[in-house]
């Protein structure tokens, strides 16, 4: 997938966000080996030190671990992954609700719209 970066947000934070999303979505499943820092940095067009900083944050957060000679791997801790998905989903919901409230919608209208969407989405499945 192509890497694009926004101005005004540190690149390592954007990388971190993307990697967290890919881990949460299962693009990198539990126990999966992550690409090497240099490989991902080259793919993203960033300095390897920038990519390393994002990887260090993932490791600090317990989302990945390093095996000395084998590389970095996604945690297999189901609770950590569940918490990651919860946090990311809460962020998306907060952003969506904030944007809808700026459009003048009340909390009740937002809830009603989400329930309506969920009903339509379940009918498509």
Segments (PLM) and residue ranges:
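Extreme N-terminal segment that seeds HTH/winged-HTH DNA-binding domains in transcriptional regulators
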Residues: 1-33, 39, 83, 87-91, ...
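Short hinge/loop at the helix->beta-strand junction immediately C-terminal to the helix-turn-helix recognition helix
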Residues: 27-28, 57, 62-63
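A short alpha-helical element within helix-turn-helix/winged-helix DNA-binding domains
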Residues: 33-44, 58
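Short, Lys/Arg-rich nucleic-acid/phosphate-binding segment
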Residues: 34, 66-74, 78-79
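Short secondary-structure transition/capping segments
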Residues: 44, 78-79, 120-123
């Amino acid at each position: 997938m192509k890497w694009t970066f926004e101005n005004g947000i540190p690149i390592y934070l954007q990388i971190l966000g993307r990697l967290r999303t890919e881990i949460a979505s299962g693009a990198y499943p539990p126990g999966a080996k992550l690409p090497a820092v240099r490989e991902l940095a080259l793919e993203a067009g960033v300095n390897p030190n920038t990519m390393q900083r994002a990887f260090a944050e993932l490791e600090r957060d317990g989302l990945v671990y390093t095996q000395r000679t084998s590389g970095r791997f996604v945690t297999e801790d189901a609770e950590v992954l569940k918490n990651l998905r919860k946090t990311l989903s809460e962020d998306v919901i907060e952003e969506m609700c904030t944007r809808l409230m700026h459009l003048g919608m009340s909390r009740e209208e937002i809830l009603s719209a989400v329930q309506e969407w969920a009903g339509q989405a379940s009918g498509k499945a």
